UniProtKB/Swiss-Prot annotation:
Cystine residue pairs: none
E.C. no: 2.1.1.166
Protein name: Ribosomal RNA large subunit methyltransferase E
Main localization category: cytoplasm
Protein family per UniProt: Belongs to the class I-like SAM-binding methyltransferase superfamily. RNA methyltransferase RlmE family.
Pfam families for this protein: FtsJ
């Protein structure tokens, strides 16, 4: 039998005792991350019926489930992740590494000539536990997501992204502020206290 490390055992204990994990199982959501988006939605009313949305870092599908329900049958949702994701009705899923150009091109092809109202990203790299390694990797994903958003958003569109405080954050924040009318930070209660993650919200893309 493989012995679990102490940190692994602690994570499992925290995971299964987590009230948001239990609530997700009860509500039929695929991950506790659904509640982060739901809390932001309750405050900011980002997602509305009929919208076109891109969901980056979508697997296992918690944010896509929430978004699909809120945009309804007249909306359009394109989701992407490096990992597999079980299908969700009316969601176009593109599997692949977002850092590769061919995956970006597939997303752009799915968007087509019509632009989107909202880009959301819960992407994070595989964490090593070493901030000097993890933060630059995370910021690289954030930069790629912002680049995509500037290509596909309609003027007035919105952008929501997971971001980690650390090197490169201030420069990135300045860049987002130059492209959106209003920029705010969100830390949902369902985000674990010890996590460095926050969510950056850009409203009103300047186009």
């Amino acid at each position: 039998m493989v012995q679990r490390s102490k940190s692994s055992a602690n994570w499992l204990r925290e995971h299964f005792n987590d009230p948001f994990v239990k609530q997700a199982q009860k509500d039929g959501y695929r991950s506790r991350a659904s509640y982060k988006l739901l809390e932001i939605q309750e405050k900011d009313r980002l997602i509305r019926p009929g919208m076109s949305v891109i969901d980056l870092g979508a697997a296992p599908g918690g944010w896509s489930q929430v978004t699909s329900r809120l945009i309804g049958g007249q909306g359009r949702l394109i989701a992407s992740d490096i990992l597999e994701m079980d299908s969700i009705a009316d969601v176009t899923f593109i599997q692949g590494d977002f850092t590769h150009d061919e995956v970006l091109q597939r997303i752009l092809e799915a968007v087509g000539d019509s632009h989107v109202d909202l880009v959301i990203s819960d992407m994070a790299p595989n964490m090593s536990g070493t901030p000097a390694v993890d933060i630059p990797r995370a910021m690289f994903l954030c930069e790629l997501a912002l680049d995509l958003a500037t290509r596909v958003l309609k003027p007035g569109g919105d952008f929501l992204i997971k971001i980690f405080q650390g090197e490169g954050f201030d420069v990135y924040l300045k860049d987002v502020r130059s492209k959106f009318d209003k920029v705010q930070m969100r830390k949902p209660s369902s985000s674990r206290d010890r996590s460095r993650e926050q969510y950056l919200l850009g409203r009103g893309f300047k186009g």
